[in-house]
């Protein structure tokens, strides 16, 4: 079920404050965050966020196409090594 329109997108307040501070100083640096649940809004376009994946911070450059998605969608938490190889087929 989608979030109600009258509530608006979910954002952690500290994340908006960090972007405002960078905007005033007109700097473009990495914004580290553990808030994977925050929705990307238009004000975030052009900034690079370091989204924590449980082990390290993954740099995510926000583009116009990402607006409306969550930050966590762009920092995968699991490493995929492929499916197991059949040992019988490998011997041949």
UniProtKB/Swiss-Prot annotation:
GO BP field: ribosomal small subunit assembly; translation
| Keywords, alphabetical | Ribonucleoprotein, Ribosomal protein, RNA-binding, rRNA-binding
Q: Which GO terms describe its molecular function?
A: rRNA binding; structural constituent of ribosome
Q: Which domain of life is it from?
A: Bacteria
Listed InterPro entries: Ribosomal_uS19, Ribosomal_uS19_bac-type, Ribosomal_uS19_CS, Ribosomal_uS19_SF
Q: Which GO terms describe its cellular component?
A: cytoplasm; small ribosomal subunit
Q: What does the protein in this record do?
A: Protein S19 forms a complex with S13 that binds strongly to the 16S ribosomal RNA.
Would you identify the family this protein belongs to, as annotated?
Answer: Belongs to the universal ribosomal protein uS19 family.
What PANTHER family does its record include? RIBOSOMAL PROTEIN S19P FAMILY MEMBER, SMALL RIBOSOMAL SUBUNIT PROTEIN US19M
The name this protein carries in UniProt is Small ribosomal subunit protein uS19
Species source reads Magnetococcus marinus (strain ATCC BAA-1437 / JCM 17883 / MC-1)
């Amino acid at each position: 079920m989608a979030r109600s329109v009258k509530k608006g997108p979910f954002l952690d307040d500290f994340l908006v404050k960090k972007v405002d501070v960078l905007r005033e100083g007109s700097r473009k640096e990495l914004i580290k965050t553990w808030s994977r649940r925050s929705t990307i809004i238009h004000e975030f376009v052009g900034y690079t966020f370091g989204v924590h994946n449980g082990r390290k911070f993954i740099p995510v450059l926000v583009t116009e196409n990402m607006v409306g998605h969550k930050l966590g969608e762009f920092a995968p938490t699991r490493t995929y090594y492929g499916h197991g190889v059949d040992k019988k087929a490998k011997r041949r």
